[in-house]
Amino acid sequence: MEKVFHLGLCIDDLKGAQLAIVPGDPDRAARISQFLDNPTCLAQTREFHVYLGQLNGHSVVVCSTGIGGPSTSIAVEELAQLGVRTFLRIGTTGAIQPHINEGDILVSQASVRLDGASQHFAPLSYPAVSDFFATQAMVQACKNLNIDFHIGITASSDTFYPGQERYDTHSGYVPKSLQGSCEEWQNLGVMNYEMESATLFTMCAALGLKAACVAGVLVNRTRQEIPNVDHGEIEKKSVAVVLEAAKVLLG
């Protein structure tokens, strides 16, 4: 097999890995890789930094996706071409329900499709839903580690500012079609905003792949917009969850 276009890897490079942990941040990918046995950097191309290591005796990939659905879809597609079948996303998030605390872990069952990339895989009537067993592994991981978590629906937006109804911007303006949208999602029980899960869930379900998503809460937007918590500690907690979930799935 020839090398895939963006990652620059061929199937032999992954040594049979069928599970990938997919953060957005390349630096976070590097940090996660250090929890694997014998980690090796396979590629560093644009936002895609790819590492291979061993977990419970199985080959596991860690690949950063960058921010948002379009680049996430590239990473997932090319990893799938290389044999990966399960994708565990790890990220950070802003909660919009008042009972959720900073530092809590959110496990996404499904996503509101506020993105555009997912529509290139299935129409809007198709649900952006996680894989049941991969999501159950995330839940089990939180329980195993005695970490406070919530499970529910996530709003997944293409944009960080207008799509999440943020007014702390250059213009301070949000288009009328999005004004009041945060309150609407709150009233519908949506837990949080992020920017990748709708694309990840939709494309994986449509392509016969498995996906789950976990995110650490940096801020609760019902109280404030700017995080003032220790990002590093929240990252450590969410990384612990995704690694434990991977172990559950790998057996």
Predicted features and spans:
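Metabolite-binding pocket within alpha/beta catalytic cores that recognizes anionic/polar moieties
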Residues: 1-144
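Glycine-rich beta-alpha junction loops
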Residues: 26, 94, 155-161, 199, ...
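Flexible, glycine/charged-enriched surface loops at secondary-structure junctions
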Residues: 39-44, 146-153, 250-251
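Non-catalytic positions within long, well-ordered alpha-helices that form the structural scaffold/packing
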Residues: 80-81, 186, 205
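Short acidic/polar active-site loop segments enriched in Thr and Asp
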Residues: 85-86, 191, 210
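Active-site rim beta-loop-alpha module in soluble metabolic enzymes
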Residues: 129-189
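Zn-dependent metallopeptidase/amidohydrolase metal-coordination segment
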Residues: 198-230
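His/Asp/Glu-rich mid-to-C-terminal helical/loop segments that flank catalytic regions of hydrolases
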Residues: 221-251
